[in-house]
Amino acid sequence: MSVVYKGQVIDSELSKNSFGGTEMMRERLIKNVDPKWLEKCAIHFSRPRQLFEDVINVLYCHDLAEDPENNILANGGWKKFDHIVFVSAWQRDQYITRFDIPYSHTTVIYNAVETQYEPVTKDVETIRFIYHTIPHRGLELLVPIFDTLAKHYPNIHLDVFSSFGIYGWEQRDEPFKQLFKRIEDHPNMTYHGHQPNDVVLEALKKSHIFLYPNVWKETSCIAMIEAIKNQVICIHPNYGALTETAANATIVYEYNEDPATHANYAFSIAAQVLKVQQENPNYFNRFTYSDRYNLARNNIDSFTNVWNQVLSLLVQNAESKKEDIIYQHSDN
């Protein structure tokens, strides 16, 4: 979708108006990774359009392996890249199985967020739910689930930050307009559309539960990482890379393909959490005061260190090969 070539961004038509998770990682890469390594590389953020002969080519995959854009990797096409970086081990294994890529040609670098886990005692008079990812990943299940929960627990509220507008694709919101209207008309729900990330982060500070009946396989989930770091209880299925992303800091239930069964699972667990909170007002704060919420591997320092290690090794290997070629020519 875009490429960081010698430290400079080259956008595509798809990426130029987008500020989703991929673009966040691109910004953090440029901001934090040593420029002397970036200067010698082209880092392709999925869907590469052009390879460069004068630098090292690294493919930075954020998409699912089955995305048709990845057919470039088939039949040994992965060899066009000097290295491939993935955002989760689950995602990496999907690509390796599909395209027969050697493990040694890959690295997993977990997505990083700038938020630090700094636990505070949150006000629990109103239990605030939040949904802060794009609509097709589970909002259609969440709204009726929450509507039923609100009939039993009137002190809950749902804030929805959700729109394809974050990618510059407002037209893709059209199938969800009635759902958005249902949210707007509900006294216990608020629809915020798409907002800058700093606005969402402020909302997360006041939120208690990220109920995420996910129906779209994700290779990682930045929304969940940011929620955990902001001391939010996350409830979700064991689908795609969500369990790996969660790193034992969430409440996980079995994924089910049937929407009604899936919704029942999510509802039951959320209702149980609310019941326990109602009986024990200290439950939420006790649950979220835990070192498991720190997610150290998703810190900027960890992200930066691994990128520096990977790129420095690639550069050193490339320079060593050049020296060997020069030496061989001199012998001849």
Model segments located where?
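A charged, aromatic-enriched C-terminal amphipathic alpha-helix characteristic of glycosyltransferases
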Residues: 19-24, 260-264, 278-322
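Nucleotide-activated donor-binding/catalytic signature segment of Leloir-type glycosyltransferases, i.e.
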Residues: 173-195
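Acidic donor-binding loop of glycosyltransferase active sites
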Residues: 205-219
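Conserved donor-binding/catalytic core segment of Leloir-type glycosyltransferases
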Residues: 121-138, 143-146, 150, 159
